[in-house]
Amino acid sequence: MKTAIISSKTSVNHLTGDGHPEQPKRVTAITERLKKNKSLIWDKPASFDQNILKKVHDENYVDMVKKSFPNQGLKFLDGDTIISPGSKDATVDAVGSVIKAIDGVEQKKFRNAFCAVRPPGHHAEKNKAMGFCIYNNCAVAAQYLMEEYKYLSLIHISEPTRLLSIAY
């Protein structure tokens, strides 16, 4: 079986402004490099029941985020996390990417998967954006695994308290 790359063109529409370290070129550089490897499977994010976001994040936070996407320009959710009109679809596709990765591995469509997404999703807390992250895609993945496949094994090589603070 092969490795899958799950990504969406909406990632480049999540704009953060000049000088911000989390830029569209982060994903385009990765995907352009990976396209040279012909043995990879390329796939798009899955559609998903957005209620899973409210199982990971406070309902008020999810509702606030959905109402916050500007029609034009940029808006700060916190001191680091910026959203733009294109962020709305990018956030949904980032979460849909982790769900597609899980389902693809579980259904043996591919051996493993890498999600090349923006905005990133591992620092957001239960009720606030943090560290460029709007939703905690990692916590959503954990929740989805527990609900759909009834197991979870998690190895986190960085500071784990963000994920654990959401999970418990």
Where are these regions (language model features)?
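Positively charged, low-complexity/disordered segments
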Residues: 160-161, 166-168
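HDAC/HDAC-like amidohydrolase catalytic core signature
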Residues: 1-156, 162
